[in-house]
Every structure is written in C-alpha cells, then in structure tokens.
C-alpha cells in the first residue's frame, strides 16, 4: 500500500525534486474494495492515476500537450512491482497512451499471479496446484472477469520499450528471487538488474 512507499516517495521528492503520487491498490490501504486484484485490474487504475498526476502537475502551466513538462517514473514493490510491470506492457500500436511515463522501477515483482499462487501453495501448505489453484482461478474469472494466467507481468514486459530497473533481493521468501531472471530476460533493452 501507499504507506509502504513513503520512504521511497520521500527520496524521490527530497533527493530528486520529483512530485509524488502514492495511491493504494484496490483493496489495500485507503482504497475501496475488499479483494486484491493482484495488479491485473490495478494496472488500469495506475494508468488513470498517471492521467490525474499529469493534470495536476503537467497542465499547470499550459494546456498544450506538446509543451507539458510532466515526466513520470512508475515504481512498485512486490505486488506493486508486478502492477508496475503490468502497466509497462499497456501499449497500442507500439505507442504508450501516457507519453509522460519515462521509465519503470520494479522491486521484487512476480512473473504472474499463477506462478505466485502456485509457489505459495507449495511453500506454505505443501499443496499442488491442482485442484485448488484451478478452482480458485475459475472462481476469479467468474467473480472478477480475469484469470491468474492472463495476469502476467512476464507477458507485459515483453511489450515494454521504455527503460526498466529490476530489483530483487535474494532473501525474499514471498516472491522467490528466481522470478526476476525470466522477467529481466523477457524485457527488451533498455533494462538493468540490481
């Protein structure tokens, strides 16, 4: 949630003089909803929030699209990192809908909702994916209109042409470190792994 990003937001603001927007994802913090959308539906909210930020900060001095000075970094941690990567693939005809987004920073994001849930079933409960994960996936599709396989940061980063910084510590037990490597490999240049 947004509170978790306060320290990073502070650094962006104080050290780099960036304006910051720290929204809560659906079902977290002060956001509405009771169920996490695991980044998939949240990616569309983030795109709307970037529009709002552009209206607040970029149109202050002019209404001309060409002369706006808004430049944005989309940065997320864990599920927020997966959301960041899911946002990164939202392109139409090779163009980003939000030309003011300049780069992405993902810190410990997962490859896909399916992979994350499958890993947690095994790590926490020593259970296989079938039948529980398959059933939960079907229920999610019925209730929320998306499924765990569709919600793939891995597929989204393949479409990303903007710079992305990948951060993943080897002590992370919730999102396994191995997930950063296929994500990094799938992302076209420019990219960096830290």
Predicted feature residues:
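Hydrolase active-site cap/lid region
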Residues: 86-149, 155
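Catalytic histidine neighborhood in serine/cysteine hydrolases
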Residues: 184-194
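Conserved alpha/beta-hydrolase
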Residues: 9-32
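The serine-hydrolase catalytic nucleophile loop
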Residues: 1-11, 178
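Alpha/beta-hydrolase fold nucleophile elbow
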Residues: 59-78
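Alpha/beta-hydrolase active-site loop
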Residues: 36-63
């Amino acid at each position: 949630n947004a509170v978790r990003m306060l320290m990073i937001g502070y650094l962006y603001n104080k050290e780099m003089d960036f304006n910051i927007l720290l929204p809560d994802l659906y079902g977290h913090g002060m956001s509405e909803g009771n169920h996490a959308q695991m980044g998939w539906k949240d990616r569309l909210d983030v795109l709307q929030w970037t529009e709002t930020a552009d209206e607040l900060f970029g149109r202050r001095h002019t209404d001309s699209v060409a002369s706006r000075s808004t430049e944005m970094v989309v940065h997320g941690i864990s599920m927020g990192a997966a959301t960041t990567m899911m946002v990164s693939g939202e392109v139409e005809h090779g163009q980003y809908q939000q030309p003011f987004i300049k780069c992405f920073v993902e810190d410990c994001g997962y490859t896909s909702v399916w992979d994350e849930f499958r890993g947690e079933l095994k790590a926490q409960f020593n259970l296989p994916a079938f039948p529980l994960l398959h059933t939960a996936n079907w229920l999610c599709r019925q209730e929320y209109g998306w499924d765990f396989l569709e919600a793939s940061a891995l597929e989204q980063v393949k479409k990303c042409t903007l710079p992305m910084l990948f951060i993943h510590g080897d002590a992370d037990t919730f999102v396994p470190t191995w997930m950063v490597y296929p994500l990094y490999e799938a992302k076209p240049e420019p990219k960096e792994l830290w």
